[in-house]
Amino acid sequence: RLRIGILLSKYSEYQVDYISSESEIGKLIEEADLIIGAGITAYEGVLRRKPVIVVGDYGLGGLVTPDTFRKHYNNRFRGKINGVRNESFSLENLEKEIYKSFNLTFQELQMMSNQTITLQNI
């Protein structure tokens, strides 16, 4: 949490929240502009049409895009595709992914949300 806070400190309009209980997830995801997380948090973020950067037990998976969505979904949003457990990453790389997230369009977010719903029903 502290590292991300430092990374984003030059942007005073951003508020970084750490979700500590499952009961908070839905409400905070709905209010968020960007989700950084793994597993169900990342999944819910995609489902709710939010930009998602996957950071998990397997390192930095990066921004979920229409091109990477299926790989992240199949990897259960656990981190880097084909990564190793507890893989480290640089804050500079996370920062690059944050900047890339600003370029996702609503149509791209909607398409990934729809794919999530379709895959749920298979």
For each predicted feature, which ranges?
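Conserved catalytic-core segment of nucleotide-activated headgroup transferases in glycan assembly
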Residues: 1-10, 14
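Conserved active-site histidine-acidic residue motif and adjacent donor-binding/catalytic loop
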Residues: 2, 16-28, 40, 58
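A short acidic, amphipathic alpha-helical/loop segment
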Residues: 4-7, 28, 44, 48-50
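Extended, folded domain segments that form the structural surfaces/walls around functional sites
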Residues: 19-26, 97-101, 121
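An anion/phosphate-binding loop that grips the pyrophosphate of nucleotide cofactors and donors
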Residues: 32
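Catalytic binding pocket for nucleotide-activated donors in carbohydrate/polymer assembly enzymes
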Residues: 43-108
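A short N-terminal helical cap/helix-turn-helix that marks the beginning
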Residues: 98-99, 106-122
